[in-house]
Design a protein with these regions (language model features):
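Positively charged n-region of N-terminal signal peptides that target proteins for export
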Residues: 1-4
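Bacterial N-terminal signal peptides
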Residues: 6-15
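Extreme N-terminus of proteins, especially the signal/transit-peptide cleavage junction
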Residues: 16-23, 344
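Acidic, metal/ion-coordinating pockets
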Residues: 20-321, 364, 368-376, 386, ...
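Feature captures C-terminal
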Residues: 24-26, 36, 49, 54, ...
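Short, compositionally biased low-complexity segments
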Residues: 30-35, 174-176, 309-311, 342-354, ...
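Alpha-helix initiation and N-capping motif
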Residues: 56, 97, 123, 248, ...
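Hard-cation-handling environments
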Residues: 307, 311-402
Length: 539
């Protein structure tokens, strides 16, 4: 596989030796910002002494530089975001995206593709933000079905005519939103298959005279590119089962004729693009939370009107970390963001407790953070067992002082807690359904689970204990979980029927339970206690 990519780049370089006139386009791209436009600390670089990140104000400085660079060279410039712009920080969440869209207006974004988290608090929020945006809001595969008529919820595409070349950008939102959002929040919305939608709008843009077609997708590049590519080849060999794509890697394999793709949804940055070895589409993706900006200069042959190569602006690759000492914060943008931050963060920086150790999400089956959260859920609701989904747990907590701001960053979604009486057999079936595809995607408390991945589906939970004893199939247990899972999201369809029949919903916010738990038990020191063990786990 790596050999094939090397051959492709050798051929690409050889082709550039006999070029005619060329023209360049610089693209700056962000994804999964999740409200991260304010300043923050780069704890992922150095947990003990983190460098300062300038957020949107540092991005504004870099964007201004890139625009000037393009102007002096006569190049084109394009600024894109591929979704999940606001939900995740106080600045983003408390303003319901207003502060983020104002920032995007100020720095001159060309387009924003709707992400699944845009619908976390209802469709009215993205609808309002679309009216505030001075740029195109894209999604070719979301349809409003109100009144039985299918109409586009957002614009399907953007066409930019640079004179030298006409470039079309088609936006795609993950159809998995229907599994990840509350049903009420996406009422009367239809998410069409990504594969057929992208193919159709590729043809539309070509018919409208676009020389270059760019796909901007809120459908991500995977964490492990080689494992995922093996899966793509396997699925292709077996025959595609639907018109929905599992990830961007599959999408570009199934839809040829896309010149460039920018991805989002999965928070892993690719310093160098993934290039599909069959269709040769380069795919780019950055890290999330506004920590970086992706910047690439693409070169096109004006005779063939084809992409002939690209280059980065730094040796490390395409992703530029927005450190404030390297990119001083733009004063005007900084003032706008800091004013909002000062208003929404009042009281959120007060001390509520301490942690003896860093509380991280690291771990295949359990983690310090997951154990803390589920233990807090169990404590608050006086349950027997507790479960929550890993996807709702967004960051780590450093050692030392803990504030409400820290807890909010970990749990930015307004999930509430509920309880339901279930049998031991139901708990086991619930877990079996979650491990059928490998990992569980769950954090738990009150139980000890042992999973053997090598066993057939439905038989992988080889040990389940509650109260330190083997689970009794027909005994009743009080299960604590979130309203999100009680609706059947994140693969928990088995819970959906119980919500209306037997669930008791408290209205207590999940993060408030964690706040109270930390206050009550401070200083805290969560431990890994073997509550979730996986045999045959991949390293």
């Amino acid at each position: 596989m790596k050999h094939l990519l090397l051959i492709f780049f050798v051929l690409l370089c050889a082709a550039t030796a006999c070029l005619g006139e060329t023209w360049s386009l610089v693209v700056c791209h962000s994804n999964d910002v999740h409200g991260g436009v304010d300043s923050s600390e780069a704890t992922f670089m150095n947990p003990e002494f983190p460098p300062q990140l300038g957020g949107g104000a540092s991005a504004a400085t870099l964007i201004s530089y890139m625009r000037h660079y393009c102007h002096t060279k006569g190049d084109g410039f394009l600024l894109l975001d591929t979704g999940d712009i606001f939900q995740g920080t106080l600045v983003g969440t408390k303003t319901k995206g207003d502060a983020v869209v104002r920032y995007m207006n100020e720095v001159g974004y060309d387009a924003w593709v709707l992400g699944n988290h845009e619908f976390d608090v209802g469709r009215a929020v993205p609808e309002k933000l679309m009216t505030e945006a001075d740029f195109s809001v894209l999604s070719a595969n979301i349809y409003d079905t109100t009144g039985g008529v299918y109409t586009h919820f957002a614009k399907p595409y953007l066409i930019k005519d640079y004179g030298k070349l006409k470039i079309g950008v088609v936006g795609i939102t993950t159809a998995g939103t229907v599994r990840e959002a509350f049903k009420e929040n996406i009422k009367n919305l239809y998410f069409a298959p990504e594969v057929t939608t992208l193919a159709a709008y590729r043809d539309t843009l070509r018919a409208l005279g676009c020389d270059i077609v760019i796909a901007a997708t809120h459908l991500g590049l995977p964490f492990d590119r080689w494992e995922a590519y093996d899966d793509v080849e396997k699925r292709e060999k077996e025959g595609w089962k639907s018109d929905y794509a599992k990830n961007t890697m599959e999408l570009v394999r199934r839809v040829p004729g896309i010149d460039i793709l920018f991805a989002g949804d999965i928070h892993v940055g690719y310093q160098e693009p993934w290039v599909d070895p069959v269709n040769h589409t380069p795919c780019f993706q950055g890290y999330g939370r506004g920590t970086n900006l992706l910047a690439v200069e693409f070169e096109f042959d004006l005779t063939t009107r084809k992409l002939i190569g690209w280059k980065n602006f730094q040796d490390e690759g395409t992703l530029i970390t927005l450190m404030s000492d390297r990119f001083p914060r733009d004063r005007s943008v900084a003032q706008s963001i800091d004013t909002v931050a000062g208003r929404v963060e009042k009281g959120f920086n007060d001390k509520i407790g301490e942690s003896v150790i860093p509380i991280t999400r690291t771990g295949e089956g359990e983690s310090l953070m997951g154990n803390l959260i589920c233990d807090a859920m169990l404590w608050k609701m006086k349950g027997d067992v507790a479960i929550t989904n890993k996807g709702g747990v967004r960051t780590d907590i450093h050692a030392g002082t803990i504030t409400p701001h820290d807890v909010f960053d970990v749990l930015p979604f307004d999930n509430t807690l509920g309880t339901v009486e279930v049998t031991g057999a139901f708990v086991k079936d619930l877990l079996e359904a979650k491990v059928i595809y490998g990992g569980s995607g769950l954090y738990v408390s009150g139980m000890r689970v042992k999973v053997d991945r090598s066993r057939p589906a439905g038989q992988r939970v080889i040990s389940l204990e509650i109260f330190g004893k083997p689970v009794v199939a027909d005994s009743s247990y009080r299960l604590v979980t979130t309203d999100y899972l009680l609706e059947g999201n994140s693969g928990m369809e088995k819970l959906a029927s119980l919500r209306s029949q037997a669930a008791i919903e408290s209205g207590v916010y999940m993060r408030d339970a964690v706040l109270e738990y930390i206050k009550e038990h401070s200083p805290i020191e969560p431990k890994l206690d073997g509550r979730w063990q996986t045999l045959d786990a991949k390293p």
